[in-house]
């Protein structure tokens, strides 16, 4: 029954309507029994006593005619004389349920309050009980002796047209309410169904179809955020495909080269050529090894929840150690290194920060022209550490836009795999810092870390 949200909401709403109607009836019934019943009894008793007083003072002849007249005025009347003979006036009672003891008490002059004392029942409204015990009774004195007179208003006659009106009203109320519930439920479910279908398309890899925002409530917000999510997932999927293609290319190229070298090694008889092949093979395996390490590091950075950033890193020492370790690169190109480093500490992940600064320094060494200078400064301002590395040579504007993209290379001849600066940017962002590039006559990377 509840396999769809549509049926669930519709049935819930209809159940609420019916339950509300039932509870309203029960509470109305309780209100009648505990509040209105005594008042109704007293009002009818007063009317009956006024009728008795009128009969006693005015002496309408005969009494039977007078009672018939009362019956025609929408009252139901039953009389019982001392011999137990009963007469009925007005609309006939549905049941004759009054007890003999009640009749005797009235004949003896005691008032009868059957309406007031009607037993309470949950699903029976005493006001409409057309029974002789649901009356008030008093004694009339006649020439033939005492006469017990029991009376109640003829509810059926009084409210016959109203009951038809009420029945039509309730029927129409239920029909219209249920119809509107079904229609409104459909209006709620329709965009949800559209979301479900769109989700199915996304599961199949289709990120191109947006859903129209048709509302301005919570569902409208959900539609808007779904479209945003769809776009983001599409971008992630494109990045994933691009990443797989790049990795495949970066791995396939050295493997193809390695296969060619193995074939050449197998065929050549020249020892010098064999050694050159072996040396080149070692270089290729080192490149693949570096690529693997950087891919693993990227994966670690993309899932950084396990990383800690509690090391007290001495940046001055860290940068000097990198420069000292890479001294051979400066010697190969006759580079001059100028450093101006403040004695600064920063709380973060020392291993990752070492990798980030190492990438920037090696990148400057690799792309600086022969016999040029590299300037490195480390300064601080209020709550900010600024690392600046500058080398001669510029980067084209189009290249600068993609310099931090994964696998982006400035030149196809470059031995780099294009991951170093992407890794550096990820590390700096994980430390809540920023990295920017400016390139005119010189190329300058600026890293800002908040203390």
Curated annotation (Swiss-Prot):
**Residues in the signal sequence:** none
Which post-translational modifications are recorded for this protein? Autophosphorylated.
Q: Where in the cell is it found?
A: Cell membrane
Q: Which GO terms describe its molecular function?
A: ATP binding; phosphorelay sensor kinase activity
Q: In terms of domain of life, where is this protein from?
A: Bacteria
Keyword hit for Phosphoprotein? yes
Regions crossing the membrane:
9-29, 164-184
Q: Which UniProt keywords are listed?
A: ATP-binding, Cell membrane, Kinase, Membrane, Nucleotide-binding, Phosphoprotein, Transferase, Transmembrane, Transmembrane helix, Two-component regulatory system, Virulence
Bilayer topology annotation: Multi-pass membrane protein
Catalysed reactions, as listed in the record:
ATP + protein L-histidine = ADP + protein N-phospho-L-histidine
Domain Histidine kinase: start-end pairs: 246-451
GO cellular component annotations of the record: plasma membrane
- By its UniProt entry, which InterPro entries does this protein fall under? Bact_Sensor_His_Kinase (IPR050398), HAMP_dom (IPR003660), HATPase_C_sf (IPR036890), His_kinase_dom (IPR005467), HisK_dim/P_dom (IPR003661), HisK_dim/P_sf (IPR036097)
Supply the EC number(s).
2.7.13.3
Positions of post-translational Phosphohistidine modification: 249
Query: Where's the HAMP domain?
Result: 186-238
Tell whether Cell membrane is among the UniProt keywords.
yes
**Functional description taken from the UniProt entry:** Member of the two-component regulatory system HssS/HssR involved in intracellular heme homeostasis and tempering of staphylococcal virulence. HssS functions as a heme sensor histidine kinase which is autophosphorylated at a histidine residue and transfers its phosphate group to an aspartate residue of HssR. HssR/HssS activates the expression of HrtAB, an efflux pump, in response to extracellular heme, hemin, hemoglobin or blood.
Name this protein carries in UniProt: Heme sensor protein HssS
Organism of derivation: Staphylococcus epidermidis (strain ATCC 35984 / DSM 28319 / BCRC 17069 / CCUG 31568 / BM 3577 / RP62A)
Encoding gene (name):
hssS
């Amino acid at each position: 029954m509840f396999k769809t949200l549509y049926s669930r909401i519709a049935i819930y709403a209809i159940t609420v309507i019916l339950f509300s109607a039932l509870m309203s009836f029960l509470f109305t019934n309780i209100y009648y029994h505990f509040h209105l019943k005594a008042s109704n009894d007293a009002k009818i008793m007063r009317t009956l006593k006024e009728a008795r007083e009128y009969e006693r003072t005015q002496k309408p002849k005969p009494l039977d005619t007078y009672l018939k007249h009362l019956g025609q005025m929408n009252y139901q009347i039953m009389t019982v004389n001392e011999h137990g003979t009963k007469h009925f006036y007005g609309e006939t009672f549905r049941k004759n349920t009054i007890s003999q003891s009640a009749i005797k008490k009235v004949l003896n002059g005691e008032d009868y309050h059957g309406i007031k004392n009607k037993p309470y029942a949950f699903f029976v409204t005493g006001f409409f009980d057309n029974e002789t015990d649901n009356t008030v009774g008093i004694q009339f004195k006649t020439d033939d002796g005492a006469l017990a007179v029991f009376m109640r208003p003829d509810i059926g006659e009084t409210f016959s047209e109203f009951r038809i009106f009420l029945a039509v009203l309730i029927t129409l109320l239920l029909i219209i309410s249920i119809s509107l519930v079904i229609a409104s439920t459909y209006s709620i479910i329709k965009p949800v169904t559209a979301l479900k279908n769109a989700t199915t398309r996304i599961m199949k890899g289709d990120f191109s179809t947006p859903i129209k925002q048709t509302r301005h409530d919570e569902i409208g917000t959900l539609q808007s955020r779904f479209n945003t999510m769809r776009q983001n997932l599409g971008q992630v999927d494109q990045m994933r495909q691009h990443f797989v293609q790049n990795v495949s290319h970066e791995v396939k190229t050295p493997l193809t080269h390695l296969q060619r070298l193995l074939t050449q090694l197998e065929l050549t008889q020249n020892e010098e050529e064999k050694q050159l092949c072996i040396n080149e093979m070692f270089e290729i395996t080192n490149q693949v090894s570096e690529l693997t390490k950087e891919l693993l590091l990227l994966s670690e950075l993309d899932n950084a929840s396990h990383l800690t950033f509690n090391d007290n890193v001495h940046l001055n020492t860290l940068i000097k150690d990198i420069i000292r370790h890479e001294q051979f690169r400066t010697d190969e190109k006759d580079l001059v290194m100028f450093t101006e480093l403040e004695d600064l500490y920063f709380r973060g992940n020392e291993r990752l920060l070492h990798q980030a600064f190492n990438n920037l320094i090696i990148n400057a060494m690799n792309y600086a022209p022969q016999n040029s200078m590299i300037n490195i400064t480390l300064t601080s301002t209020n709550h900010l550490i600024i690392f600046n590395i500058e080398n001669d040579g510029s980067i084209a504007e189009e290249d600068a836009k993609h310099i931090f993209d994964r696998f982006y290379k400035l030149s196809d001849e470059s031995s780099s795999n294009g991951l170093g600066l992407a890794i550096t940017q990820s590390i700096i962002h994980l430390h809540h810092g920023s990295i920017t590039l400016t390139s005119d006559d010189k190329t300058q990377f600026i890293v800002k870390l908040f203390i």
